[in-house]
A protein has these predicted regions:
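Compositionally biased, low-complexity flexible segments
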Residues: 1-33
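N-terminal low-complexity, intrinsically disordered patches enriched in charged
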Residues: 11-15, 21, 101, 135, ...
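Anion-binding (especially nucleotide phosphate/pyrophosphate-binding) glycine-rich loop
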Residues: 36-183
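Phosphate/pyrophosphate- and phosphate-bearing ligand-binding catalytic cores of soluble enzymes
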Residues: 43, 50-53, 186-349, 354-358, ...
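Residue-level signal for inorganic ion chemistry
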Residues: 68, 92, 152, 184, ...
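Generic structural marker for isolated residues within well-ordered, non-membrane alpha-helices
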Residues: 132-133, 321, 368
Length: 390
């Protein structure tokens, strides 16, 4: 199957390998903003804010909650057949929804399923990501332990090519099971066909086409040790060097401590976590762009200041969005309104309670303009915007 198009596979139960056990399922979290006993739930003129980690966003004309793959597909087909705009919601940790809400059907994917067969892992799209990571660590498997604490659902991870602390899901995902709205078939896409890149994928590049149903991973049995540590701060906290391995549970716990210290682990009592985590991606610059950027750094900050630089590939260099924001004068806690920069991490924009989406966007635009004025770099938002834009 070429990278240009997903080809329908022969009909079979979606997401199961021949001879594998069915996914163990569990009902959605009863502590969530909408509780129900199973099956499709339909609500009308319902606020979407409780379904996002920003706690922002107006109402949807209709909100459907689906707990099985068949329910997800049926809801998508119904919307497509009627020409109704469709918004997919998983954990809501990467969404910025406009104050006017969504004029269409919002589909909350609340499927559950965790299947571990040796080192092969299969997750239903609605599976809570942090729980799944914890269970793989309990099984002493390596590969996603440094992605602990990232809010949201498993189905969102390939879309964004979620990554943190030296790991990206693209390094362990083998296949993604998705519903193709164009062919109206369930398709199985290989890692290569997902076209992963930094915080991007084929799914993000063509958001109207695919609905992720299940995600398959190949993890590593390293006798209870982690994957080689790629993030210097993690290695330093563990007293080892980059490239070393440590007990997999120690790697996870260290990442959780790092994330908590930056307000990146959800806590309803901590407004620093009323966010989407990192609001901007780290810029990737060509050699010419980096040279121009470095000249601006010297001009603004002096010869002794060296900007962060990490090889993105053979031709390009990645720099730090958080560093750019800070050096442009936007410090931790910046802002006077109900939307402010986190008090723990300059890369997170937060709702301090009572904010509107427009408050958040005004802050984001101010940061983007300030960084561009200071260094000539235009930051790009990481969360998906719905009904609004920067």
């Amino acid at each position: 199957m070429g990278a240009g198009r997903a080809v329908p596979r022969a009909p079979r139960e979606p997401g199961l390998r021949p001879g594998s056990r069915p996914l163990r399922t569990a009902p959605p979290d009863p502590a969530g903003p909408f509780s129900y006993s199973g099956g499709v739930q339909e609500l009308h003129d319902t606020a979407l804010a409780p379904l996002t980690t920003f706690r922002l966003g107006g109402p949807a004309d209709r909100l459907i909650t689906a707990t099985t793959d068949d329910e997800v597909i049926a809801a998508v087909r119904e919307a497509d057949d009627s020409g109704t705009p469709l918004l997919l919601i998983g954990g809501g940790s990467n969404l910025v929804i406009g104050d006017k809400g969504f004029a269409g059907t919002a589909l909350r994917i609340a499927t559950r399923g965790f299947e571990l067969d040796g080192t092969r892992l299969e997750l239903a799209a609605g599976e809570v990501w942090t729980d799944a990571v914890a269970r793989t660590v309990e099984a002493r498997l390596a590969g996603i332990e440094c992605l602990a604490g990232i809010p949201g659902s498993a189905g969102a991870t390939p879309i964004q090519n979620v990554g943190a602390y030296g790991q990206e899901v693209s390094s362990t995902i083998t296949e993604v099971i998705a519903y193709d709205r164009e062919s109206r078939e369930t398709v199985t896409m290989s890692n290569a066909e997902c076209a992963f890149s930094y915080r991007h994928s084929r799914f993000k590049g063509d958001p109207e086409r695919f609905v992720v149903l299940r995600v398959r991973f190949e993890l590593e049995d390293a006798a209870g040790l982690s994957a080689p540590l790629r993030y210097a701060e993690t290695a330093r906290m563990l007293g080892v060097g980059p490239g070393d391995r440590v007990p997999v549970d120690a790697a996870r716990e260290t990442v959780l401590k790092l994330r908590s210290g930056k307000g990146m682990v959800l806590d309803p009592e901590d407004h620093d976590t009323w966010s989407a985590g990192s609001f901007f991606t780290n810029p990737i610059l060509t050699r010419e762009e980096f040279a121009a950027f470095h000249a601006r750094v010297v001009e603004r900050l002096g010869d002794g200041v060296v900007p962060p630089a990490y090889p993105a590939d053979d031709e390009n260099t990645k720099t730090s969005a958080a560093w750019l924001i800070d050096k442009s004068g936007f410090t931790k806690g910046y802002g006077t309104g109900p939307a402010r920069i986190s008090t723990k991490h300059t890369l997170a924009l937060t709702n301090r309670g009572g904010a509107t989406t427009e408050d958040l966007l005004a802050l984001a635009r101010e940061v983007v303009a300030g960084v561009h004025e200071a260094f000539g770099i235009t930051l790009v938002n990481e969360p998906v915007t719905v009904g609004v834009s920067l």
